[in-house]
Amino acid sequence: MERTKERSSFRKKFIGDRKFYMMVLAVAVPIMIQNGITNFVSLLDNIMIGWIGTEQMSGASIVNQLIFVYNLCIFGGVSGAGIFTAQYFGQKDHEGVRQTFRYKFWMAVILTIGTILLFFTVGENLISMYLQGEGTAQQIADTLKYGKQYLDIMLLGLPPFMMVQIYSSTLRECGETVLPMKAGVVAICVNLLFNYLLIYGVFFFPRLGVRGAAIATVLSRYVEAAIVIGWTHRHTEKNAFAKGLYSTLKVPANLTKKILVKGTPLLFNETLWASAMAMLTQCYSIRGLNVVASLNISNTINNVFNIVFIALGDSVAIIVGQLLGAGDMKKARDTDNKMIAFSVMCCTCVAMVMFVMAPLFPMLYNTNAEARELAKYLIMITAFFMPQNAFLHATYFTLRSGGKTIITFLFDSVFIWCVSVPIAFVLSRYTGIHVLVIYACVQLADLIKCVIGFVLVKKGVWLQNIVSS
């Protein structure tokens, strides 16, 4: 009898009905599709470059790791305001949404200008940080050359990327997830087509190698920006915030202060987290250029599978954030419990598929056998820890939806710099432990975060409306 009651209680707390899952999937699936297609095309892009040569692939992958830091800076910069956007939309306060949009604009402009200046001045030195491991002088010189070629062109794509993130994040926070997905699909098709034409020099197009890949990416970003911006302003009946959006670019001082208080830790968090990921890759790269190549392969494959827990985490921020903005705390907690459980269950299934297929993916690349073998085991290790990452991602966005950005800052970037990076740094430089063991130790350390996240979510420290005043 008691077991029956326990099962009933468990189902009520963690399992939703069909209507609940349809609601969650309505938000999550478009994000999954957009991110999935993006990452799948990144995979194809990666394979296309990889077929030219290992040095070209490694050079482009190092630059993409550096640009990833910028991408997350933008994500962190707009996400701080996004907490307010979701709650303003929950209150149907369209002027509040406009003001948060304007804040996002200025924050993104500042970050983009700073990033372009940084890469123009010390870009070559940053690439060289990843070329200190084993490898011939010629291999290192070629990797640096191709990386610099790729970087110089990719910088032209930062402004449209910035605008896409500002508009798409605002649309999603207002419940419109389909249009950003459609724009992403079109951009991806453009990217894939011109990758093929420009990397290999098909028809009358020149054979540009890594430069062709960069040009295709930049072109696709301008196409995506044109679609998202154009659609938003043509459909003001659906996007009420777009009416009079640029009548002024001023942001009220009191709102700026509130967003900075909540959003600055989030910006620092994303920036420090992304730079920590770049540092982890640099630590692994000490073990040689084959490790750089294998990490590029495994990370590209991992990103295709990670879309599930990333999209479900984003859905937590949107759905729970709107419930908090509407003041329905009881429903917010109940919804959050079910969404976390759903994310972990989904990712357990995905991880099984990923683990079984891990030996097949590296075979797609034209690289040496050692790099392929390393990539296979890196993918397997990541698959094993995917349910853990799903739980962490969902709890992170739960805390963030309630404005607990200081906690997420400590929970995320402070942890990775104080625990994960030191583990990788010490083990890679001062021991003879195999790089796969180092990689697994870094993943295992995140169990500490699981415990912290579980306690904080259960205590309900995130249950608050931050825009009611």
Residue ranges and their predicted role:
Residues 54-65, 147, 151, 214, ...:
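Small-residue hotspots at the loop-to-helix junctions and early N-terminal turns
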Residues 26-45, 153, 187, 220-224, ...:
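Transmembrane helical elements of multi-pass membrane transporters/channels
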Residues 32, 36, 40, 44, ...:
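Generic alpha-helical transmembrane segments of integral inner-membrane proteins
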Residues 1-28, 85-157, 207-263, 320-385, ...:
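Short alpha-helical transmembrane segments in multi-pass integral membrane proteins
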Residues 36, 40-58, 127-141, 199-208, ...:
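Helix-terminus/linker motif at the lipid-water interface of multi-pass membrane proteins
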Residues 33, 45-49, 60, 85-90, ...:
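Hydrophobic/aromatic residues within transmembrane alpha-helices of membrane transport systems
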